[in-house]
Design a protein with these regions (language model features):
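Phosphate/dinucleotide-binding and metal-coordinating scaffold of catalytic cores
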Residues: 1-313, 317-434
Length: 434
């Protein structure tokens, strides 16, 4: 394990390296420098002089000289923050670098530059963060089995010190977002995110996400491919990464921008993010806007039908090629357990409404270039698809009878989602998913 040091020794700067479109090696793009609580970015002249230079993200970081401050209300440009770890990665960093374990691991004590520089290099998107503008040193992990990664994740959750081998194995996944235990693995010509169960789970979250992702794909949505593995008697979800492309001389990286960054918000302001606002951004800034709007409407509907209320703005993203945005495949579709029937989405649906109902989807439909008839048909098709594929996907997941009963009608096709919907849709919600 890395020797422990004071958490107050925060770095003053970091250098941003970027994989340009179609390239397999990074180049330095610029520097982040701290100025009080805010962090400014400026492009390096060598990068500005490149004929193939692209803005990290425009309009937030336009390709120009001089220090660029973060947008109002932000301490760091959102497109840079998108590459930082979230709760799980920060727990691993606290364990690894500062020796803080279990309940002593206050992730709020970590500053952003520390998180960027102490997390793994194979982060989501096309950026990495280094201490040097001249020499790129990849922070990668040694090869580890899923069993070893699972063991390491459990130890971090329990606050148990890691051996150097387990510490290095888990380090690779520190740059991933989200709060749940996870790691990254390489599988020949694919890269995968491995998601593990948590000690605080009250139901099989891994299986519920697998079922939702498989049903989303069968419903015609563009969703990241997934598979379920059994390791050391526990379920592990493997999600194929869509921001990596294997070519003859290495890996290309695809830049990604979260919807939170599109909105110019941070986590404290995320409650203002909305599907309505994302639809407007798609109309003006995304490739194939009409088809993309229909896809997003489908994802909204499916999130409600499957009980995924964790559809916050970091769980939507677009590929960025330096000029245009293209919606990424759907990811992190994970049904949430609810105590009562009523539920609300993390993102507003239309106006100030966020209740998880099909009626709200229908009200929002015009923002997705769908009339009432087309929207209702789309919803009916999804309900039919869930019913038709339910048994098959439940068998793929090897769900127990108890799990089927919990997932069906508590998460998937919960009666609450049909309240206020047209009778034709309400009639489709009268039976169990099976």
């Amino acid at each position: 394990m890395t020797s422990e040091r004071s958490i107050d020794q925060a770095p003053a700067e970091a250098y941003v390296w970027i994989w340009l479109p179609g390239k397999t090696e990074p180049v330095v793009a610029g520097r982040i420098a701290r100025d009080g609580r805010r962090m400014f970015f400026n492009y390096g002249q060598s990068y500005l002089d490149r004929e193939d230079a692209v803005p990290i993200y425009e309009p937030e970081l336009p390709l120009e000289s001089g220090a660029i401050p973060p947008s109002a209300g932000l301490s760091l440009a959102g497109c840079l923050r998108d590459g930082a770890p979230d709760a799980w990665g920060r727990r691993v960093i606290l364990n690894r670098v500062f020796g803080r374990k279990g309940k002593d691991a206050d992730i709020g004590a970590l500053d952003e530059l520390t998180c960027l520089l102490e997390s793994g290099s194979d982060r989501i998107g096309a950026l990495d963060f280094q201490c040097s503008p001249d020499k790129y040193v990849s922070r990668t992990a040694q090869t580890a089995t899923l069993g070893e990664l699972l063991n390491a994740a459990e130890k971090v959750e329990a606050g148990v010190p890691l051996t150097p081998e387990l510490d290095q194995a888990l380090f690779h996944g520190t740059s991933l977002g989200g709060a749940r235990p996870k790691a990254m693995i390489e599988d020949e010509d694919r890269k995968m995110i491995a998601k593990f169960s948590s000690s605080t789970d009250t139901y099989n979250v891994v299986k519920s996400e697998f079922v939702a992702m498989r049903l989303a794909a069968k419903a015609g949505l563009e969703a990241a491919p997934v598979r379920l593995e059994r390791v050391a008697g526990k379920d592990v979800l493997l999600v194929e990464r869509f921001d990596r492309v294997k070519v003859r001389d290495g890996w290309q990286r695809k830049a990604m921008i979260s919807a939170l960054t599109l909105f110019g918000l941070d986590e404290m302001m995320a409650r203002y993010a909305s599907y309505e606002g994302l639809a407007e951004a798609i109309r003006h800034r995304f490739t194939s806007p009409k088809a993309t709007l229909h896809e997003l409407f489908g994802r909204l509907v499916f999130n409600i039908l499957c009980g995924n209320t964790d559809d916050h703005a970091r769980n939507h993203a677009g590929f960025w090629d330096g000029e245009h945005l293209t919606l990424t495949p759907a990811y992190d579709i994970c049904p949430q357990r609810r105590s009562g029937n009523e539920a609300s989405q993390a993102m507003l649906i239309v106006d100030d409404k966020r209740l998880s109902t099909l009626a709200n989807c229908l009200e929002a439909a015009p923002h997705f270039q769908l009339d009432a008839k087309a929207a209702e048909e789309h919803i009916a098709e999804q309900i039919g698809s869930i019913r038709d594929a339910w048994d098959e996907v439940c068998e793929e997941a090897a769900l127990t009878e108890v799990e089927r009963n919990l997932f069906g009608r508590r998460m998937f096709l919960n009666p609450f989602v049909f309240e206020g919907a047209p009778k034709s849709l309400q009639s489709l919600g009268d039976a169990e998913p099976a």
